[in-house]
Amino acid sequence: MGGVAKCYTLSLTLPKLDKDWLEQFSTSLKESSERFRVNLIGGDTTRGPLNITISMMGSIEINSSIKRSGARAGDDIYVTGSLGAAALCLKKINEGVKPSESELISLNKPIPRLELGSALRNIASSCIDISDGLEQDLSHILKSSNVGAIIYSDKLPLVNSVSNYVKDSNDWSL
């Protein structure tokens, strides 16, 4: 972590050609590419079950990346953004419940914190994206660094809909 994004490849598998979906996807991809100043340099398109794979490439100075294995006892843990909104949106969709507009944006237009990753390069002892969830991804850092952690659930940055869901269900699995 901590590098500068340069370019990416896209592998797209589609079950059928849906021109409206493809146009919306392409427009969003172009907007993101322009926002983060990265270019699509190649990839593949095939027919099959829906699968979208983006591989980002970048550069970083030698020996300056933020690794999973750098955490030390006594370090504080920080989370950027809010947790659970995209997962709650997907859960609602799968249950036939209409998600809010902000939940849809969290699911469909996640914001990678590329600039922050670069800015933390000489500050953070360890770093990871939490695309697999806080518990699972934090455990990667803890195992790699051979340390433990205490999480204070009342300090987690949750949007109101996620906070309400957790209070009502006591389900922290999002």
Where are these regions (language model features)?
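Helix-biased detector of long, well-ordered alpha-helical tracts
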Residues: M1-L174
